[in-house]
Each structure stands twice: as C-alpha cells, then as structure tokens.
Amino acid sequence: IWKGSQGTVTKTEERLIEQVITEYYDVFFNGFNGFTPPQREDLRKSLTIDDRNNKDKANESQSDKAMRIEKEIDEIERRRKELKVETLSFNSFYEYAMQRVPDICHENHIANIDYSTFRYMMKDFYRGGNHDKTLNEDLDSSLFDETFIVFEIDSIKDDPLLFPLVTLIIMDVFLQKMRIKKSRKVLVIEEAWKA
C-alpha cells in the first residue's frame, strides 16, 4: 500500500512487514509475557555478534559487556510488553506497526527502511483519514451475515490505491464465507476483463 501499485518492495521490507504482521496477530491471540529462555539466548548471540563491530566498546570488560547486553535485552522485552492489541482492525495494526517497525529496525541495525513514508502513506487508512472506513469497518456486522453481496467496482477500477484493496477485501469476504459449510456459495465475476 505504501509503495503504490507500481512500487517494488525489497526483500528486507517484505520480511519486516511479515514479522510485524506475525507479531501483531501473536500479541492479539497469545499476548507477550516476555522472551522464553531460547529467545533470550538467541537475542544474546545476535547482540554479541553485532557488538563485535562496535569500536567504542572495544576496551569494555567481558562482564560489563554481558551486563550491557542483558540490559538491552530487558529494554527490548519491556518495549514489546508495552505493545497491546485489544481488537483486530487496521487502526490497531497501524498503532502496533508505528511502534514496532522502528524498534525492529533498531534491534537489527536496519538503516534503509523509510518508515516516515510508510507512516505517511498508511495514515490515510487510519482513524480520521480519507479511507479510514475502508479497512476498519467491522466485516462481521456489515458483510459477513449477508446472503447476497454485490461489489460494484467500476468507479474505482482505475484507482491505483483503492482497487487492489477492494479486490483483497472481496477475496477475504469470499474465503471467510467459504468456511461456513451450511450453505452454497457462488462467486460471480461479471465483466472481469474490464477490471
């Protein structure tokens, strides 16, 4: 969304967004109560490797270095614990991502992510933005219980921002309806060649 329909996403950006989405759902369904011992050990190893390139800390003793790394892990854990996801919506994802993306970039020393542009482009779909209803409408109450739905997309077929989003929403509604086994489902795409 933030790159537009003609933009390309780098592998780093793709992995970053995948991580944020995975963590977002994990926090909603399971919460985050802190790192497990294997996760702490993995972080410790990563931070130790990153620390080897830190010339400022070259004269630091091993115990001071270990203590500093443990404090850094505790700080990362504290920031993660503060992130709560109460409801699943684009608003809550936006709030989560705006805090988590800079943290992930800092923790992994990723310098080439332009999260200012990401934030600016996504804000249109956030609370109060021009398209805030597009991704924040409660599908369970508005579309999910309907027996017959018509999506008229002629007016947005040339919109590079809305057309891909509406297409994804249509597919999501259809896939969710497919999971209900009590009735027949039909997806009719009329004049598909125009879209």
PLM segments and residue spans:
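P-loop NTPase motor domains
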Residues: 1-195
